[in-house]
Amino acid sequence: MPNKRNVELLATLKENLERAQGSFFLVNYQGLPAKETHALRQALKQNGARLFVAKNTLIRLALKELGLPELDGLQGPSAVVFYEDPVAAAKTLVQFAKSNPKGIPQVKSGLLQGQILTAKDVEALAELPTMDELRAELVGVLQAPMAELVGVLGGVARELVGILEAYAEKKAA
């Protein structure tokens, strides 16, 4: 007979997996002190991600019940990272691990839009620009022609003013 807490955790885990459309990272957090775990949660939260600690059996059961593939790495302590932007979450995890002398949290694997990711895939994902960075680049690309047009039109107006001033001076003389 499953206990009430596990039933609630399973329901929450399934709800989060459905909301994330089956996209998440699986990480090992073992050896991370409570203070640093809290700091990791805060860093992830700032980037629209969330750390959810659950037993491997519950993670396996939730994946199975939702028809998602079982991932490698469901051994030892595991936490699931749900995210809005996979690149921002991957960057946060990789940077946090680099700043930790033990290299924790360790990414085990992940699932992104139905594709199984290895730890190396997640590290490669962290090298990509985030959605906000891509949006900023797009705005810059779109603004450049407009800025050039404004400069050209401003130059034409300055030349016209110069011609009119020269004409006025010539008439006055």
From Swiss-Prot:
The keyword Ribosomal protein applies. One of its GO terms (biological process) is translation. Pfam families: Ribosomal_L10. It comes from the Bacteria. One of its GO terms (molecular function) is large ribosomal subunit rRNA binding. The N-terminus is blocked. The keyword Lipid metabolism does not apply. InterPro entries: Ribosomal_uL10, Ribosomal_uL10-like_sf, Ribosomal_uL10_bac, Ribosomal_uL10_bac_type. Keywords: Ribonucleoprotein, Ribosomal protein, RNA-binding, rRNA-binding. GO terms for cellular component: ribonucleoprotein complex; ribosome. SUPFAM superfamilies: Ribosomal protein L10-like (SSF160369). PANTHER family: 39S RIBOSOMAL PROTEIN L10, MITOCHONDRIAL. Belongs to the universal ribosomal protein uL10 family. Part of the 50S ribosomal subunit. Forms part of the ribosomal stalk which helps the ribosome interact with GTP-bound translation factors. Forms a heptameric L10(L12)2(L12)2(L12)2 complex, where L10 forms an elongated spine to which 3 L12 dimers bind in a sequential fashion. HAMAP family: Ribosomal_uL10. Forms part of the ribosomal stalk, playing a central role in the interaction of the ribosome with GTP-bound translation factors. This is Large ribosomal subunit protein uL10. It comes from Thermus thermophilus (strain ATCC 27634 / DSM 579 / HB8).
